[in-house]
């Protein structure tokens, strides 16, 4: 049986396809758990869907130069460490990410642990976490055929 950790959150745009994918994976016998942050919608909707949810600290990535930008390295380091603990405890065989604050730490923790990363990008214009991780992901699926990501393959929306 394969252990899949799904990462995504913040908005319904990330959590809805995550939940749909989780249900499909469970129907095929996978053990599924999710990782999110306390800031996003996932804290409510993922448990309501009957899925297990582990929390890690959010790492907002400021789009302008301000004081918060200088806090990112320490925040990211801590979040990657926490995500790594989750992946180890869940004995993850693969990490599937959908974007949002939680995804980048999960992707980096998976890369560090040599766990394959799979990405689903729901937007025509990809988010920052998915742009970064697409370079080392084993598969990148998109909801739109022309989404500009390395290795992108159009798969539609789950």
Predicted regions and their residues:
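Conserved nucleotide-sugar phosphate-binding/catalytic loop shared by glycosyltransferases and other
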Residues: 3-9, 28-78, 84, 155
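Hydrophobic alpha-helical packing residues
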Residues: 25-26, 110
């Amino acid at each position: 049986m394969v252990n899949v950790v799904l990462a995504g959150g913040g908005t319904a745009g990330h959590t809805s396809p995550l939940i749909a994918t989780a249900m499909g994976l469970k129907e095929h016998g996978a053990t599924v758990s999710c990782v999110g942050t306390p800031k996003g919608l996932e804290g409510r909707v993922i448990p309501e869907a009957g899925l297990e949810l582990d929390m890690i600290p959010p790492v907002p990535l400021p789009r302008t130069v301000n004081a918060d930008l200088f806090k990112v390295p320490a925040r990211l380091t801590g979040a990657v460490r926490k995500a790594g603990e989750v992946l180890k405890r869940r004995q993850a065989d693969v990490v599937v990410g959908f974007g949002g604050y939680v995804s980048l730490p999960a992707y980096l923790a998976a890369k560090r642990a040599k766990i394959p990363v799979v990405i689903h990008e729901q937007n025509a214009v990809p988010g920052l976490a998915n742009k970064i991780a697409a370079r080392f992901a084993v598969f990148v699926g998109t909801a739109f055929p022309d989404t500009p990501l390395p290795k992108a393959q159009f798969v539609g929306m789950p």
